Amino acid sequence: MTIDTTNESDNSPTNSPGLEASARTFSLNASKMVRITDDYADEVFIEQNDVVIEKPRMDPLHVRKLMETWRKAARRARTNYIDPWDEFNIHEYPVQRAKRYRYSAIRKQWTEDIVDVRLHPDSFARGAMRECYRLKKCSKHGTSQDWSSNYVAKRYICQVDRRVLFDDVRLQMDAKLWAEEYNRYNPPKKIDIVQMCVIEMIDVKGSPLYHLEHFIEGKYIKYNSNSGFVSNAARLTPQAFSHFTFERSGHQMMVVDIQGVGDLYTDPQIHTVVGTDYGDGNLGTRGMALFFHSHRCNDICETMDLSNFELSPPEIEATEVAMEVAAKQKKSCIVPPTVFEARRNRISSECVHVEHGISMDQLRKRKTLNQSSTDLSAKSHNEDCVCPECIPVVEQLCEPCSEDEEDEEEDYPRSEKSGNSQKSRRSRMSISTRSSGDESASRPRKCGFVDLNSLRQRHDSFRSSVGTYSMNSSRQTRDTEKDEFWKVLRKQSVPANILSLQLQQMAANLENDEDVPQVTGHQFSVLGQIHIDLSRYHELGRFVEVDSEHKEMLEGSENDARVPIKYDKQSAIFHLDIARKCGILEAVLTSAHIVLGLPHELLKEVTVDDLFPNGFGEQENGIRADKGQKPCDLEEFGSDLMEIAAEMGDKGAMLYMAHAYETGQHLGPNRRTDYKKSIDWYQRVVGFQEEEELDSDCGKTTFSSFAPLTRHEILAKMAEMYKEGGYGLNQDFERAYGLFNEAAEAAMEAMNGKLANKYYEKAEMCGE
């Protein structure tokens, strides 16, 4: 960057008195100082064969001149700043008191204080749900007051519950954490999400609530939405950021609805697996499916080694235009020389199951580093130490330790380019120079023109003055919390590709190491649920491009609701097959019904010919041969799928397998009648029925279309098999007698006395 220093006052370092003496003093202390800019930090250390070698330090006179030049540029920018809201005379409106509520995403705590504001009574913008007002807030720094910061106060048009506003703040601050983590990977462009809080106008009747954000100057653009919309603007960063959050969270959440000015975003939305938090905009896996259908991995995704989400050939071909736009953007995107670590070398840990809570809730359950872990000892670490233990503490010590620091950060206005601030500076670290993937193993750069001896004295005096490290004491504590937060979170990264998941699982089995991630069923299930949602969206015509003739036909006829929608069956079957491989019960059962020619709810018009257009045989039997299994026909393949669904807990599939083993039908050439297995499946169904009687809410979800059998009917079938014997089951009249009596009692409870008498008669015959 070139800064014009002409027409400045003659106070440059070259004309200052006593320059030579100052230069000598500066040279003596230069060895104890570290660099403040990344432009020259790269010249301090080089790495050869994993050995860090110190290069000659740069000229201190040049550094001093550079620092003075930057100070002049900052003063000039401050002096020439023109408030865009001067014409509205907000300073003429009365000062009002407001209670401000701020949320800490790390500590999951709310803090409140009283602030002075001036609110313009007329709204200047209006959306679908909220309207915006101009506001200025008084920022107090010491004894001075500053009203120069511009804010936007957003109020809901319709009356909403008070909790909705606080949920919106929690959502945006959680998304802001993900933006900070994204910046740590040194993408081509850093991003930031606007700080937001809630203010309550306590001096106004009714104490209305507003969302408060900094005013962003520039052109407001919506890059993507929570329903799969992607802007035509050739921007790679917003889409890569959404993809990044999905993989980094272990498939548990995704930040979408990216909008704002440049790379300063506001009003995002978060999709989670459970789909019940973060408001009505959280579409769960359905929203994730809509995003991946319109998303194509770009250069940033590839550089960060994010996995390509599986799409069918027709889906890929349908987005050639989007790929061309991305190619044009590639030419204009200047990527810094950053080397990212490959996924195969990154270590991630097992992702928590969805029943234990979403990613952010799990990660907050951690311990803050104690005082001894962050203490710098002059005896063991000198000023030039670049060990992993020293670097984070040095960076934290370089930050101010003001109690009002959070307020100061929020009070300074931001512009489109303000994303590269303190968080961005802390993120300038090489995270890709180690094969282990742990950030602590990488070598960040020290930053700041700071004498470390004085730093330690300042740090020790501050620590002694506050006694202990409280949660609100200093920036160091907050940064330590963030480091611990992301240290745990990075271990949950999971690829968004079933093939990558399978390879990761194979690697874990081969390594047999605790540090190698074990792929859980939950990770497969989330990915599979996204694919099953895509298959359902295809069937509903969500991605159908309706031509004018078809549109007129749909709008002009009353019976068109019964006309089947012509959708992309190939893509729907493609996603159904991947969902089946991921172990989604609905996908497994739907595939089984299609193969066996049974009615099914999902993809009703798909037949076995659509599922296997080239015929069933060689490919499927080749896979079975690789697993050491015998070749099968189509009927046995369907029976295998049905048995898998039964093992997964579907009662209809259990009844099907029990009946199949009882009669020997629809089992294929490699299976025969087996009374023992039939009774085993019948017993499982009875067990499920007993659980449902104890608790009606704990019944297993079934996707089968089989007519359920009553308890007394199942018991009677089991009794008949024990009475007859054979097919792997020993004849047992005593057991048959007991089962017939149980069936009779169950029939009496079902108010079927005639059938109960029949069962009692059969029981007496077994007793004779």
Swiss-Prot record:
This is Eukaryotic elongation factor 2 kinase. Residues 402-411 have a biased composition (Acidic residues). Its EC number is 2.7.11.20. Residues 1-21, 402-446 are annotated as: Disordered. Phosphorylates elongation factor-2 (eEF-2) at two threonine residues that are conserved in all eukaryotes and are located within a GTP-binding domain. Calcium(2+)/calmodulin dependent activity. Inactivates eEF-2 by catalyzing its phosphorylation. eEF-2 catalyzes the movement of the ribosome along mRNA during translation in eukaryotic cells. Monomer or homodimer. Interacts with cmd-1 in the presence of Ca(2+). Pfam families: Alpha_kinase (PF02816). Belongs to the protein kinase superfamily. Alpha-type protein kinase family. Residues 102-309 form the Alpha-type protein kinase domain. InterPro entries: a-kinase_dom (IPR004166), Alpha-type_PK (IPR051852), eEF-2K (IPR017400), eEF2K_a_kinase_dom (IPR047588), Kinase-like_dom_sf (IPR011009), TPR-like_helical_dom_sf (IPR011990). It is an enzyme of class 2 (transferase). ATP binds at G279, D280, G281, N282, L283, G284. The gene is efk-1. PANTHER family: EUKARYOTIC ELONGATION FACTOR 2 KINASE, EUKARYOTIC ELONGATION FACTOR 2 KINASE-RELATED. GO terms for molecular function: ATP binding; calcium ion binding; calmodulin binding; elongation factor-2 kinase activity. Keywords: ATP-binding, Calcium, Calmodulin-binding, Kinase, Nucleotide-binding, Phosphoprotein, Serine/threonine-protein kinase, Transferase. Calcium(2+)/calmodulin dependent activity. Undergoes calcium/calmodulin-dependent intramolecular autophosphorylation, and this results in it becoming partially calcium/calmodulin-independent. It catalyses: [translation elongation factor 2] + ATP = [translation elongation factor 2]-phosphate + ADP + H(+). One of its GO terms (biological process) is myosin II filament disassembly. Residues 1-17 have a biased composition (Polar residues).
